[in-house]
Amino acid sequence: MHRRQRKIKTDTVQPFLSIVIPAYNEERRLPGSLEKVLSFLQTRDYPAEVIVVDDGSTDNTVGIVEGFMARYPFVSIIKNDHRGKGYAVRTGMLAARGTYVLFSDADLATPIGEVDRLLAFLGDGYDIAIGSREGLGAQRINEPGYRHLMGRVFNLLVRLMAVGGFQDTQCGFKCFRREVAQDLFQRVQLYGAEAGLAKGGMVTGFDVEVLFLALKRGYKVKEVPVQWHYGANTKVSPFLDSARMFMDVLRVRLNDWRGKYKGTGDRG
């Protein structure tokens, strides 16, 4: 049974949903991903916005997004210097106007329709809903066994050193109430306002810091099993990026010991 397609609302009122997509040299994957996002939004009866944050791409990523902007007024782009995914996500989350704000990887490894599952929990009183590739109901499709094993080892380290209680902190599909996103992403230290320039594709452990701060701030976080597709053209380097993410976990713990997150528990 197919849903009747609707014209996507582009009112000047506050969007119900903001979709933030960080992009670095995504000229090949982004057109298909944006078409899928737009097709999904045509089946939903609420105003929305799509924000692509270009992370200093050297290909035609910006031109592709500008082509969509010419046809869809609710699609926009923010152009950053190349400072990495964490900084790009932060930029988009702070710029978003929606009641709820989702960030999603540019390849849509988690299908955009899975946002319905996250929104259900936000509507039920949670502050943050994070997509998870683990747990009952989660689906990991076409992922090599060694990649899964490395992910589980990293998650164990995250649990021991920074954020306990989550089976998957790294799925690039997380949704926040807007005021919560504003609070948390203004407080991040690793890839915040002072983030330096990056070299090449840069996958980081920024998610761990965001969740660490969320728990310190007393926010309610729900881990939601989702479908996730492994892409053969993934930009994640299993060794280099794993090492960088591990160092980020250490930096979160070190920042906490140094008192850089002091006072984050006082929400009033």
Give, region by region, the residue ranges found by the protein language model.
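Hydrophobic helical membrane-anchoring modules
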Residues: 1-16, 156, 187-268
